[in-house]
Amino acid sequence: MRAFFAVPLVDSLRPALAAVQEDLRAVGAAVSWVSPDSLHMTLKFLGEVPENSRFDLRPPAPFDLELAGVGEFGGRVAWAGCRGALDPLRELAAQAEAAGERAGVPRETRPFSPHVTIGRIRSNRNLDKLRARMARWKEQVFGTWPVRRAVLFRSETSPSGSVYKVVAEYPCIAT
Protein backbone atom coordinates (compact mmCIF):
# COMPACT_ATOMS: atom_id res chain seq x y z
CA MET A 1 0.00 0.00 0.00
CA ARG A 2 1.09 3.58 -0.62
CA ALA A 3 1.00 5.23 2.81
CA PHE A 4 1.88 8.26 4.90
CA PHE A 5 1.62 9.55 8.47
CA ALA A 6 -0.35 12.76 8.91
CA VAL A 7 -2.29 14.99 11.25
CA PRO A 8 -5.79 15.39 9.80
CA LEU A 9 -7.10 18.93 9.59
CA VAL A 10 -10.03 19.60 11.92
CA ASP A 11 -13.32 20.09 10.10
CA SER A 12 -13.82 23.59 11.51
CA LEU A 13 -10.83 24.90 9.50
CA ARG A 14 -11.73 23.36 6.14
CA PRO A 15 -14.13 26.14 5.04
CA ALA A 16 -11.47 28.82 5.61
CA LEU A 17 -8.95 27.01 3.44
CA ALA A 18 -11.60 26.28 0.81
CA ALA A 19 -12.23 30.06 0.65
CA VAL A 20 -8.49 30.68 0.20
CA GLN A 21 -8.36 28.11 -2.59
CA GLU A 22 -11.33 29.74 -4.30
CA ASP A 23 -9.70 33.17 -4.09
CA LEU A 24 -6.38 31.86 -5.44
CA ARG A 25 -8.10 29.85 -8.18
CA ALA A 26 -9.40 33.12 -9.64
CA VAL A 27 -5.93 34.14 -10.92
CA GLY A 28 -5.92 31.25 -13.40
CA ALA A 29 -2.64 29.68 -12.35
CA ALA A 30 -1.94 26.06 -13.29
CA VAL A 31 -2.65 24.52 -9.89
CA SER A 32 -4.22 21.20 -8.93
CA TRP A 33 -6.13 22.14 -5.80
CA VAL A 34 -6.42 19.62 -2.96
CA SER A 35 -10.01 18.78 -2.07
CA PRO A 36 -10.90 20.46 1.24
CA ASP A 37 -12.02 17.05 2.53
CA SER A 38 -8.49 15.71 2.01
CA LEU A 39 -6.50 18.50 3.70
CA HIS A 40 -3.95 17.32 6.26
CA MET A 41 -0.39 17.89 7.45
CA THR A 42 1.96 15.16 6.26
CA LEU A 43 4.39 14.04 8.94
CA LYS A 44 6.17 11.38 6.87
CA PHE A 45 5.52 10.00 3.39
CA LEU A 46 6.29 6.28 3.48
CA GLY A 47 5.64 5.31 -0.14
CA GLU A 48 4.92 1.66 -0.85
CA VAL A 49 4.90 -0.51 2.29
CA PRO A 50 3.49 -4.03 2.82
CA GLU A 51 -0.24 -4.23 3.61
CA ASN A 52 0.45 -5.86 6.97
CA SER A 53 2.91 -3.17 8.12
CA ARG A 54 2.58 -2.15 11.76
CA PHE A 55 4.12 1.03 13.09
CA ASP A 56 4.90 2.08 16.64
CA LEU A 57 3.95 5.72 17.08
CA ARG A 58 3.37 7.33 20.47
CA PRO A 59 2.13 10.88 20.01
CA PRO A 60 2.79 13.41 22.76
CA ALA A 61 0.07 14.92 24.94
CA PRO A 62 -2.62 16.82 23.03
CA PHE A 63 -1.49 20.23 21.80
CA ASP A 64 -2.78 23.13 19.75
CA LEU A 65 -1.47 24.70 16.57
CA GLU A 66 -2.58 27.85 14.85
CA LEU A 67 -3.25 27.60 11.13
CA ALA A 68 -1.97 30.86 9.67
CA GLY A 69 -0.56 32.32 6.48
CA VAL A 70 -0.32 31.14 2.89
CA GLY A 71 2.71 30.75 0.66
CA GLU A 72 4.47 28.48 -1.80
CA PHE A 73 7.57 26.32 -1.95
CA GLY A 74 9.71 26.89 -5.02
CA GLY A 75 6.85 27.30 -7.47
CA ARG A 76 5.68 23.74 -6.79
CA VAL A 77 3.47 23.64 -3.70
CA ALA A 78 0.87 26.10 -2.40
CA TRP A 79 0.53 25.80 1.37
CA ALA A 80 -1.11 27.09 4.54
CA GLY A 81 1.28 27.47 7.45
CA CYS A 82 1.29 26.55 11.11
CA ARG A 83 2.57 28.14 14.27
CA GLY A 84 2.11 27.57 17.96
CA ALA A 85 3.14 24.35 19.74
CA LEU A 86 5.76 23.33 17.18
CA ASP A 87 7.96 21.34 19.60
CA PRO A 88 5.40 18.53 20.13
CA LEU A 89 4.63 18.61 16.41
CA ARG A 90 8.32 18.19 15.57
CA GLU A 91 8.53 15.36 18.12
CA LEU A 92 5.60 13.65 16.40
CA ALA A 93 7.22 14.11 12.97
CA ALA A 94 10.50 12.67 14.32
CA GLN A 95 8.61 9.63 15.63
CA ALA A 96 6.98 9.15 12.23
CA GLU A 97 10.38 9.45 10.56
CA ALA A 98 11.87 6.84 12.94
CA ALA A 99 8.90 4.48 12.44
CA GLY A 100 9.39 4.71 8.69
CA GLU A 101 13.11 4.10 9.02
CA ARG A 102 12.47 0.95 11.10
CA ALA A 103 10.26 -0.26 8.24
CA GLY A 104 13.04 0.31 5.71
CA VAL A 105 11.84 3.67 4.38
CA PRO A 106 14.76 6.02 3.65
CA ARG A 107 15.13 9.01 5.96
CA GLU A 108 13.92 12.34 4.58
CA THR A 109 16.86 14.58 3.69
CA ARG A 110 14.97 17.87 4.04
CA PRO A 111 14.05 19.23 7.47
CA PHE A 112 10.42 18.94 8.54
CA SER A 113 8.50 22.05 7.49
CA PRO A 114 5.01 22.15 9.04
CA HIS A 115 2.38 23.04 6.46
CA VAL A 116 -0.86 21.93 4.84
CA THR A 117 -0.59 21.49 1.08
CA ILE A 118 -3.56 23.27 -0.47
CA GLY A 119 -2.46 22.88 -4.09
CA ARG A 120 0.24 21.52 -6.41
CA ILE A 121 1.56 24.06 -8.89
CA ARG A 122 1.83 22.46 -12.35
CA SER A 123 3.55 25.19 -14.37
CA ASN A 124 4.69 28.81 -14.29
CA ARG A 125 1.49 30.03 -15.97
CA ASN A 126 0.29 33.04 -13.95
CA LEU A 127 2.67 32.12 -11.12
CA ASP A 128 3.48 35.79 -10.48
CA LYS A 129 -0.24 36.54 -10.17
CA LEU A 130 -0.64 33.60 -7.80
CA ARG A 131 2.21 34.84 -5.61
CA ALA A 132 0.75 38.35 -5.55
CA ARG A 133 -2.65 37.00 -4.52
CA MET A 134 -1.04 34.80 -1.85
CA ALA A 135 0.47 37.94 -0.31
CA ARG A 136 -3.06 38.96 0.70
CA TRP A 137 -3.23 35.86 2.89
CA LYS A 138 0.32 35.95 4.26
CA GLU A 139 -0.64 37.12 7.77
CA GLN A 140 -4.15 35.68 7.90
CA VAL A 141 -4.93 33.57 10.98
CA PHE A 142 -7.45 30.87 10.11
CA GLY A 143 -7.95 29.48 13.60
CA THR A 144 -6.83 27.06 16.27
CA TRP A 145 -6.02 23.51 15.24
CA PRO A 146 -6.32 21.13 18.20
CA VAL A 147 -4.05 18.15 17.53
CA ARG A 148 -5.48 15.07 19.20
CA ARG A 149 -4.21 12.25 16.98
CA ALA A 150 -1.90 11.20 14.20
CA VAL A 151 -3.13 8.92 11.42
CA LEU A 152 -1.59 6.38 9.08
CA PHE A 153 -3.32 6.94 5.74
CA ARG A 154 -3.41 4.74 2.66
CA SER A 155 -3.34 6.78 -0.53
CA GLU A 156 -5.28 5.40 -3.48
CA THR A 157 -5.05 7.21 -6.79
CA SER A 158 -8.06 7.68 -9.02
CA PRO A 159 -8.77 9.73 -12.16
CA SER A 160 -10.31 12.44 -9.95
CA GLY A 161 -7.31 12.59 -7.59
CA SER A 162 -6.01 10.81 -4.53
CA VAL A 163 -8.34 9.25 -1.98
CA TYR A 164 -7.06 8.81 1.57
CA LYS A 165 -8.27 6.00 3.82
CA VAL A 166 -7.44 5.63 7.51
CA VAL A 167 -5.36 2.53 8.25
CA ALA A 168 -4.48 3.26 11.89
CA GLU A 169 -4.99 6.04 14.43
CA TYR A 170 -2.55 7.08 17.14
CA PRO A 171 -4.22 9.23 19.82
CA CYS A 172 -2.36 11.94 21.68
CA ILE A 173 -2.34 10.88 25.31
CA ALA A 174 -1.58 13.15 28.25
CA THR A 175 1.20 11.79 30.44
Labelled PLM ranges:
Residues 1-175:
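Histidine-dependent nucleotide/RNA phosphoesterase domain, centered on the 2H-phosphoesterase fold
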